[in-house]
Each structure stands twice: as C-alpha cells, then as structure tokens.
Regions:
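N-terminal leader/capping segments at the start of a protein or of a new domain
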Residues: 1-70
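Structural signal for conserved beta-strand scaffold positions within catalytic alpha/beta enzyme cores
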Residues: 37, 74-77, 154
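Conserved short histidine dyad/triad with adjacent acidic residue
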Residues: 75-99
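Short, solvent-exposed loop/turn segments at secondary-structure junctions
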Residues: 85, 113-115, 122
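Short, conserved beta-strand element in jelly-roll/cupin
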Residues: 97-117
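Conserved metal-binding segment of the jelly-roll/cupin
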Residues: 126-146
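Double-stranded beta-helix
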Residues: 143-186
Length: 186
C-alpha cells in the first residue's frame, strides 16, 4: 500500500497520513510532484540485470522519454544480500538535490522518498507500480531500509544520470526510517 505522511520539518514525530491514492496524488500535485500508478507486471528473474529490466519495460520507458525528453535511464536493483547495500543506503539517506527533473518507476518492492519542500517534509512510501517525479532542485532523500528489496527504473533529463548535490543537513536522521515507517503503518 502506498502512503504519504506530511510533517512539519521540525516535528518528525507528528504527521498527517494519507493512504488513499487520490489523496496522495492531490497532496503531491500541490508541490509539483507527479505520482501515478503504472502497470508493473513483467516477471523478472531474481538475477535480472539492467538490460533485462529495461527491455521488459521498454514501452513504459519509451512513453516517458517521449513525454519528458529524458536523456538517460538506469536501473537500481538491491536485495538484502547486495554487498554494497549499506554504502548505497547511506548515500541515498543524505539530503540532496539534483539540477534536473527525475522520475522513479518502482517495478518491484518498495522504498521511502522524503521531499523537503519549504517547511514540510513529505514522506512518500512507493510500492511496486508507483511512479514518482522529483522536480529539479527539490531537496530530498531516499530510504530503502536495512534489508532492501526493490527494483526501480530511474529516468533523467541529463545524459549524466544520477548526480547529487548534498546539502550537508542532518534532517534525515530525525525522521523515521523506512523500517520504522512501515512498522507504524501496520
């Protein structure tokens, strides 16, 4: 189940929870974030590489490239046994911005995006089939949990792909992790 919690950036212990897809979409649209549910029903093998994932979802990728002019696409696929899961998690947990507009399409698993917009933090739990955009220069971070299990197609408007400018803020450490967030929803 996708979910959104909107917090004041100085009150990570209190937030307004939305679990209805239309409500999530409407709240995110207010800050210029696109949130959609796409079909993610291609069967991927456990060892599917980037080329296999991109081939399986080529129609969706082509549609997005045509619509937004994306110049680069990659796949991030992590599982609990990934040897660099801790390194990746720490990198993505640091608040950062990108100069370009980016889109994430979750084709397996889930992850938690935090969008820091003005005085609010929007925690968006993305699940299989969710597509989320992050507007250029939006401060954000991402948590995949201690034992990640997700496959996500990432699309960028620049040929360089994922290039982050880290803010140096420690705000991410004050908000619930993916594991804490999901436990609270249960």
């Amino acid at each position: 189940m996708s979910a959104l919690t909107v917090y004041l950036d100085n009150q990570p212990q209190f937030g307004e929870l939305y679990t209805d897809f239309t409500s999530i979409k409407n709240q995110l649209n207010k800050i210029g974030v696109q949130f959609e549910h796409w079909t993610a029903n291609c069967k991927l093998s456990a060892d599917a590489d980037q080329a296999s994932v991109l081939a399986a979802y080529s129609d969706s990728i082509d549609k997005l490239k045509e619509q937004y002019g994306f110049q680069s696409v990659d796949v991030i696929k992590l599982n609990p046994d990934h040897p660099e899961k801790v390194v990746f998690r720490q990198k993505f947990l640091a608040e950062h911005i990108h100069d370009d507009f980016e889109v994430r399409f979750f084709v397996e698993g889930r992850g938690l995006f935090y969008l820091h917009v003005e005085d609010n933090v929007y925690a968006v739990l993305c699940e299989k089939g969710d597509l989320i955009s992050v507007p250029a220069n939006t401060t954000h971070w991402f948590d995949m949990g201690e034992n990640p299990e997700f496959t996500c197609i990432r699309l960028f408007t620049t040929p360089d792909g994922w290039v982050a400018d880290f803010t140096g803020s420690a705000i991410a450490k004050t908000f619930p992790t993916l594991d804490e967030y999901v436990a609270k929803l249960s």
